[in-house]
Design a protein with these regions (language model features):
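Short, conserved beta-strand element in jelly-roll/cupin
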Residues: 40, 50-67, 109
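A short hydrophobic beta-strand segment most commonly corresponding to one strand
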Residues: 84-88, 98-112
Length: 112
């Protein structure tokens, strides 16, 4: 299980931060208000630069996803991996569905 946080830095760009499971366990108990969503996308999908719609964590349940930040760095996520999305401002990130299987993920709002 890989846990990666994306956040907006002082430079208004999105950055990656690897989290250990214990750090994620602390965040995961702070569920915020709003709906838990199941997101489905085709195997080959693309969403240009955008910000996270809210502080949330995204659990990949099937398929593969790639996230790219402004400096060109990319990370790939497979089932069981978690993306903690907190880049609410700035340039944001790109997401891609990769591989041959449709992508399904679970988005859970984070509280403060």
């Amino acid at each position: 299980m890989k846990v990666v946080r994306i956040y907006t830095g002082a430079d208004h760009q999105t950055h990656f931060q690897d989290l250990d499971v214990e750090a994620f366990a602390t965040l995961a108990t702070k569920v915020g208000e709003g709906a838990v969503r199941v997101n489905q996308g085709p195997a080959k999908s693309f969403s240009d630069f955008h910000n996270a719609p809210r502080r949330q964590y995204v659990v990949i349940t099937s398929g593969m996803m790639e996230v790219e930040i402004a400096d060109g760095t990319k990370r790939q996520f497979v089932p069981g991996d978690v993306l903690v999305a907190e880049d609410l401002t700035g340039k944001g990130h790109i997401t891609r569905g990769i591989g041959d299987d449709p992508r399904v993920s679970l988005s859970v709002p984070l509280g403060e």
